[in-house]
């Protein structure tokens, strides 16, 4: 219990510090802010190991396409994977709910790194250009796109069906899908 609280304290303080330190990067090239995201991924990995003795095992990195566009469909069980996946994939673009951009400082960084937003609860005109944005990002930058198909954090034992958007991305864009399973919610 105490170790968990110490972990949370240092993780959140470190995350806030990294975001604040990278505020000046918001006027610099995008890649600088992307590096900040990767640092956050390594920070959470360090905190998990140092404070909780959690070792992270990643299996199947040899299946990540090297020379073609792809997208990642990942389960979403905690805040962990949103940071950690940035240490595995080459500066991914996240598809995320629009509301996250309203978070001061953090939302500014999400916007700067080129996150693709979607209004989850309603069909809006903003969502119509969704697939065009994905095509543009992947073809122009060669960055993979990460989507959380259940559209919300889900406990490991909860089986929530995937949203239709994932299959539509696969059908419309003809990109390879790299599925990611995890157990970070335990």
Predicted feature descriptions by range:
Residues 15-29, 34, 38, 66-123:
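Catalytic core of membrane glycerolipid acyltransferases/transacylases, capturing the structured
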Residues 51-59, 127-129, 186:
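Short gly/ser/thr-rich secondary-structure transition/capping motifs
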Residues 1-55:
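N-terminal membrane-anchoring alpha-helices
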Residues 106-107, 144, 155-186:
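A cross-family acyltransferase "interaction/gating" segment
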Residues 69-71, 142-148, 176:
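Residue-level preference for the first positions of well-ordered beta-strands
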Residues 76-78, 150-154:
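Short glycine-rich anion-binding loops that position phosphate/pyrophosphate groups of nucleotides
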Residues 111, 115-142:
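A membrane-cytosol interface segment of integral membrane proteins
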């Amino acid at each position: 219990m105490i170790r968990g609280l110490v972990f949370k304290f240092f993780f959140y303080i470190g995350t806030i510090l990294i975001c604040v330190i990278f505020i000046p990067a918001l006027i610099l090239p995008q890649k600088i802010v992307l590096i900040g995201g990767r640092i956050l991924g390594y920070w959470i990995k360090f905190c998990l190991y140092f404070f909780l003795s959690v070792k992270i095992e990643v299996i199947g990195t040899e299946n990540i396409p090297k020379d073609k566009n792809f997208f990642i469909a990942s389960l979403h069980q905690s805040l962990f994977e949103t940071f950690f996946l940035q240490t595995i994939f080459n500066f991914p673009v996240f598809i995320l709910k629009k509301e996250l951009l309203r978070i001061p400082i953090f939302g500014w960084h999400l916007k700067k790194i080129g996150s693709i937003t979607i209004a989850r609860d309603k069909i809006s005109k903003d969502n119509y250009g969704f697939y065009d944005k994905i095509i543009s990002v992947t073809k122009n930058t060669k960055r993979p796109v990460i989507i959380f198909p259940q559209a919300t954090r889900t406990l490991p034992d909860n089986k929530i069906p995937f949203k239709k958007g994932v299959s539509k991305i696969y059908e419309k864009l003809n990109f390879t899908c790299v599925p990611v399973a995890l157990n970070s919610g335990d």
